[in-house]
Each structure stands twice: as C-alpha cells, then as structure tokens.
From Swiss-Prot:
Gene3D superfamilies: Aldolase class I. This is Triosephosphate isomerase. It catalyses: D-glyceraldehyde 3-phosphate = dihydroxyacetone phosphate. GO terms for molecular function: triose-phosphate isomerase activity. GO terms for biological process: gluconeogenesis; glyceraldehyde-3-phosphate biosynthetic process; glycerol catabolic process; glycolytic process. Pathway: Carbohydrate biosynthesis; gluconeogenesis; Carbohydrate degradation; glycolysis; D-glyceraldehyde 3-phosphate from glycerone phosphate: step 1/1.
Length: 243
C-alpha cells in the first residue's frame, strides 16, 4: 500500500532561529495527524542541524534540497549523502525545476544524484515536469517521460518518490487541475511499471486544494513550496481529509 508523503520545500527561506520557532509552532499541530502519511520538511542546509535536534523523537522527517553523487571532494557548494545522514536526513530532493533552470542540471546529473542517495539509504524525491512553452507545444508528455526514464535509470522505484511539478504552476498561483495532475501521475506510474511507486504533485499546493488533490487515485502526496512556510497552512495540508 502506498503511504503518502507530504513534503514542504522551504527553498532559500528560514534562518536557524526562524526554523526553530517554526518547528515549535508546527509540531503540536501535527500531533493528531494520522499515521497513514509521512510529514517531511526540506529546510535550507544551514538549518538542518538545528532542525534535526528539534524534531528528534517526533513524527516530522527531514529532507535535503539536493545531494551530490560523491561522498567528498572538490565540489564547492555541494553536500554529500554522508553529511546529510549525520543529521538524520531521510529524503533528498533532486531535479527540482529551479536547479534545472538556473544551473542547467541535466537528467544524467539528476540520475547520478538519485542513485547516490539510494546507495546511502536516502530516499530521493525526483522532480519532473514541463514548462508552459512545452505544454503549449503539446510536448508535455514526451518531456516528462524523458525526464522519468533518464532520471530513474538504474534506480529502485520502491525506494524513491517522483514529484510531478508542472513548472508553469510553481509559485505562480496557477494550479494544474486535480484530474489532469492525476492523469499525468498515472502515466508516470505506467512508464515506470511500478504499482507501488509514490508519486507527488507539486505546484501552488495550498490548504484550499489539498483535499481535492489527495482524493485522486494516483496522487500519493504533495511537494509544497510557499504554503509550507506558514506552520498553520502546512499543518492543514498535512492534515488533509479525503472523506
């Protein structure tokens, strides 16, 4: 049975002090959250250590916002799997549309990151999705399938998460219709050929649309950006209801 993963990606937000304050407010709000789902936050690297101390022994799990494929070396600004494991990090986001856009990350690099994460016992959250231009040209499915096939090559689909994040819906206020998001997630499941693959939707997820999204048969969680920066908002998302 697929256990949903509700993950908040803080991106380049929150100092260590702000992260501690947030955590103190957030943890009581998820004390009664059902155990049929994972609740995850991906803080900036600088806040991971203090977050690890704050969430120890609670149900809140940590993710990194990236991970390198080497354990150490001359890779300025990168972070290795072994460094993350020191701080009780369980997940690692790879292939997010922002590194793809701003740093020209390739599917091959994303695949190396994902394989390295798995090799060290981390669960990669592999992001895929089309731009507005690709969607308008009718290329969305071809683009997403390429990202899935190349990004997941030689990985174990039972030990990763795929996040479908249409780029045109990230931080824009535009949301992919739940039925369309579900259709794409179903296609991804078919391309991978893994019925138990966890597939998230990401793109302007908020308290107002979480229940509809999570009622979809092929959506197994969400990757939340801006709405995860407010503890009450993210708690409402974590406490989604489908009935």
């Amino acid at each position: 049975m697929r256990k949903p993963v509700i993950a908040g990606n803080w991106k380049m937000h929150m100092t260590c002090a702000q992260a501690r304050e947030y955590t103190a407010m957030f943890l009581p709000l998820i004390e009664a959250t059902p155990n049929d789902r994972h609740v995850v936050i991906a803080p900036p690297f600088t806040a991971i250590s203090s977050m690890a101390e704050a969430v120890g022994g609670t149900r809140l799990e940590l993710s990194s916002q990236n991970v390198h494929w080497e354990d150490d070396g001359a890779y300025t600004a990168e972070v290795s799997p072994t460094m993350l494991l020191e701080h009780q990090v369980r997940y690692a986001i790879v292939g997010h549309s922002e590194p793809r856009k701003y740093f020209s990350e390739s599917d091959e690099q994303i695949n190396r990151r994902a394989r390295s994460a798995q090799a060290h016992g981390l669960i990669p959250i592999v992001c895929v999705g089309e731009s507005d231009e690709q969607r308008e040209r009718g290329e969305a499915e071809r683009v997403i399938r390429r990202q899935v096939e190349q990004g997941l090559e030689d990985t174990d689909p039972d030990k990763l998460v795929v996040a479908y994040e249409p780029i045109w819906a990230i931080g824009t206020g535009k949301t992919c219709e739940a039925s369309e998001a579900n259709r794409i997630c179903g296609l991804i499941r078919g391309w991978v050929g893994a019925s138990e693959l966890i597939i998230q939707y990401g793109g302007s997820v908020k308290p107002g649309n979480i229940d509809e999204l999570m009622a979809m048969s092929d959506i197994d969680g969400v990757l939340v950006g801006g709405a995860s920066l407010d503890p009450e908002s993210f708690a409402r998302i974590a406490n989604y209801q489908t009935s």
